Amino acid sequence: MIKNLPQIVLLNIVGLALFLSWYIPVNHGFWLPIDADIFYFFNQKLVESKAFLWLVALTNNRAFDGCSLLAMGMLMLSFWLKENAPGRRRIVIIGLVMLLTAVVLNQLGQALIPVKRASPTLTFTDINRVSELLSVPTKDASRDSFPGDHGMMLLIFSAFMWRYFGKVAGLIALIIFVVFAFPRVMIGAHWFTDIIVGSMTVILIGLPWVLLTPLSDRLITFFDKSLPGKNKHFQNK
């Protein structure tokens, strides 16, 4: 019997209900006005403020994606520096299991969710596009934006940090999620619901089976025993 089965099932039900609330209604029901209002709010700001235009352009440049990796790495490094050799090895392996989980859940989400939709910049007409307002390399459109893979990866990182490093680390990771995921919404490369519905659906249905069961701990133990360079065994928390 899985110890946290009631919580896992509850989270799965919430995730499924969230997705169906968006998927079943014609034109996505109450979600579409929310999506449209958020898109047009930020889209109008692009021509009202040059500073905002540049902010959105720069935060959707590929280099900014590298900054998100740096932020995640620095947070994990802050814990790594405090550990001895076995503890440091453990943190590296947690990162490996986190990456493996992110890849698997992202692929499953893309394959199993029966949705393909273009970003709002490719859906609405008579709108402002950063790529047309500035000659700066930036991502302002996507032919298939659902679910939001970038947001999904950052949410998985947040959950792992919470699970293995505590609430404070989890909250800092959530701040990183907001800072690096929502510029995609501001520029129009993603709908708000790509993240709030799409990414969250995959997280609520898939991730509990990794973090609320012994699976993640067993994977960490497996890699600790299998990978070279091991000096001491460690115990999972």
Curated annotation (Swiss-Prot):
Q: Catalysed reaction per UniProt? A: di-trans,octa-cis-undecaprenyl diphosphate + alpha-Kdo-(2->4)-alpha-Kdo-(2->6)-lipid A (E. coli) = (Kdo)2-lipid A 1-diphosphate + di-trans,octa-cis-undecaprenyl phosphate
**Membrane topology, record value:** Multi-pass membrane protein
Q: What does the record give under GO molecular function? A: phosphotransferase activity, phosphate group as acceptor; undecaprenyl-diphosphatase activity
What domain of life is recorded for the organism? Bacteria
Q: Where in the cell is it found?
A: Cell inner membrane
- Impact when changing residue 190 to A: Lack of activity
What remark does the entry add?
A: In E.coli, lipid A contains typically a monophosphate unit at positions 1 and 4' (bis-phosphorylated lipid A). However, one-third of the lipid A contains an unsubstituted diphosphate unit at position 1 (lipid A 1-diphosphate).
Question: What function is annotated for this protein?
Answer: Involved in the modification of the lipid A domain of lipopolysaccharides (LPS). Transfers a phosphate group from undecaprenyl pyrophosphate (C55-PP) to lipid A to form lipid A 1-diphosphate. Contributes to the recycling of undecaprenyl phosphate (C55-P). In vitro, has low undecaprenyl-diphosphate phosphatase activity.
Q: What is this protein called?
A: Lipid A 1-diphosphate synthase
